[in-house]
């Protein structure tokens, strides 16, 4: 017997859709207004820099022959499906966990779109201190990291606290 979607964690998928919209809109804006590798300083430690990443986080496997595009696409699809199954099995009241899953799904789908359409992930957020630059990233990466941190945080919450949170207390 199936459950009504609104009673499951899938109710929170609107957050994944929001992440995808904001992510793809920001990337489109950067691609429209910047040349590849163009950098515009905004404040002393933050630039907008249009970059393409053919690998994963920190350009992992970026120097390979192209197979990594499909590998990372498969991972994004697999993780998104797995998290949607977990959301379906959870209740809508499990807000923290479902929001975390939705953030990860939205980020994964935003970067998946880039891989399939552009052949690489579009990055543009560039933090730096003097000549040391943190790897350039995007809104999708940020959503994935926040979602993963929330999953870890949720793991530290006691069952009694989870029950209270889910009741809205």
UniProtKB/Swiss-Prot annotation:
Entry GO MF terms: aspartic-type endopeptidase activity
Membrane topology: Multi-pass membrane protein
Catalytic activities: Release of signal peptides from bacterial membrane prolipoproteins. Hydrolyzes -Xaa-Yaa-Zaa-|-(S,diacylglyceryl)Cys-, in which Xaa is hydrophobic (preferably Leu), and Yaa (Ala or Ser) and Zaa (Gly or Ala) have small, neutral side chains
Keyword Chloroplast: no
Domain of life: Bacteria
Biological process annotations from GO: proteolysis
GO CC terms: plasma membrane
Active-site residues from the entry: 123, 141
Main location: membrane
InterPro entries: Peptidase_A8
Pathway info: Protein modification; lipoprotein biosynthesis (signal peptide cleavage)
Function, in words: This protein specifically catalyzes the removal of signal peptides from prolipoproteins.
Protein name per the record: Lipoprotein signal peptidase
């Amino acid at each position: 017997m199936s459950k009504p979607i609104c009673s499951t964690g899938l109710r929170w998928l609107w957050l994944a859709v929001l992440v995808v919209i904001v992510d793809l809109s920001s990337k489109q804006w950067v691609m429209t207004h910047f040349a590849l590798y163009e950098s515009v300083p905004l404040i002393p430690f933050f630039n907008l820099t249009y970059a393409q990443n053919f690998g994963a986080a920190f350009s992992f496997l970026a120097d390979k022959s192209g197979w990594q595009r499909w590998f990372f696409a498969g991972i994004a699809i697999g993780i998104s499906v797995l998290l949607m199954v977990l959301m379906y099995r959870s209740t809508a009241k499990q807000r923290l966990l479902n929001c975390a899953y939705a953030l990860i799904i939205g980020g994964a789908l935003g970067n998946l779109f880039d891989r399939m359409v552009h052949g690489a992930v579009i990055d543009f957020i560039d933090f730096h201190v003097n000549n040391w630059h943190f790897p350039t990233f995007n809104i999708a990466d940020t959503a994935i990291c926040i979602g993963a941190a929330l999953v870890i945080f949720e793991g530290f919450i006691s069952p009694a606290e989870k029950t209270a949170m889910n009741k809205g207390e």
